[in-house]
């Protein structure tokens, strides 16, 4: 995927609600959010209206940035 001008590898996860990326700097304002995973709850930064390109397909959506074992593309971007 290409996000914020940076090229990253990510997993397409149809079971994940949200798109969560490992620590990176994104432009714009963010707000704190808590998400639940297998290891319990994690505090992440929520960025809205971020342009993302997945295999040549462009979309704009909400991206969460925080401590995650892998970059995950969730249903919020897959359904667009």
Regions found by a protein language model. Name each.
Residues 2-80:
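Aspartic protease
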């Amino acid at each position: 995927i290409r996000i914020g001008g940076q090229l990253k590898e990510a997993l397409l996860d149809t079971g994940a609600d949200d798109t969560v990326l490992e620590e990176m700097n994104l432009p714009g304002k963010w707000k704190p959010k808590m998400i639940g995973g297998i290891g319990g709850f994690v505090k992440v930064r929520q960025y809205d209206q971020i342009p993302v390109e997945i295999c040549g397909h462009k979309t704009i959506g909400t991206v969460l940035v925080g401590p995650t074992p892998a970059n995950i593309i969730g249903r919020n971007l897959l359904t667009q």
